């Protein structure tokens, strides 16, 4: 699953600085 903005983060392992990271 992917997220694109910090507001998408909830697990503490995604989206830092608006970057795309898996979580």
Curated annotation (Swiss-Prot):
Tissue: Expressed by the venom gland.
One Gene Ontology cellular component annotation held by this UniProt entry: extracellular region
Main location class: secreted
Domain of life where this protein originates: Eukaryota
Keywords: Secreted
Protein's cellular compartments: Secreted
Entry's family note: Belongs to the u-CNTX family.
Protein's name according to its UniProt entry: U22-ctenitoxin-Co1a
Origin species: Ctenus ornatus (Brazilian spider)
